[in-house]
């Protein structure tokens, strides 16, 4: 197998794995929130924070749920359009990864508000992993030229 072909197959496999990972993460969390609604513990955990006043606990929960479902939708679009195959630029995948960064900021902010610093640290790691995935996805131009070294 030619090195160029091997590199193309490897990149496609990595893009597919990134796409499937985030599809799974946001699918389970976002759709789970839509189906289950606001859990009973949500008020206990966040009721003493300013989120109880603004935007309100119910609104905060649904904003987060919609954010996660939006990330799931972008991941699904990236998969359905076959961006991992390399026939087109991974635009939906990039957008989903950038959106995911903001979702992790939302999640981390909530944990920080409740002084749950272990969970905040975990979310920081998820944020960092997402940033690494984004750098990898943006690592080549549409013509295949390497761009990571230019960052």
Q: For the regions a protein language model found, what residue spans apply to each?
A:
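Extended, low-polarity transmembrane helix blocks
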Residues: 1-32, 61-66, 70-151
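Membrane-interface interhelical connector segments
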Residues: 34-56
């Amino acid at each position: 197998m030619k090195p160029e072909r091997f590199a193309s197959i490897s990149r496609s496999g990595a893009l597919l794995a990134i796409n499937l990972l985030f599809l799974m993460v946001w699918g389970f969390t976002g759709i789970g929130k839509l189906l289950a609604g606001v859990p009973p513990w949500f008020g206990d955990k966040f009721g003493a924070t300013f989120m109880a006043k603004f935007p309100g606990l119910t609104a905060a929960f649904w904003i987060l749920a919609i954010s996660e479902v939006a990330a799931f939708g972008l991941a699904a679009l990236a998969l359905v359009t076959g961006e991992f195959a390399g026939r087109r630029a991974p635009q939906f995948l990039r957008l989903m990864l950038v959106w995911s960064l903001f979702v992790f900021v939302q999640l981390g902010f909530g944990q920080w508000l409740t002084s749950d610093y272990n969970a905040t640290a975990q979310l920081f790691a998820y944020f960092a992993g997402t940033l690494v995935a984004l750098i990898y996805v943006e690592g080549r131009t549409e013509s295949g030229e390497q761009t990571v070294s230019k960052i």
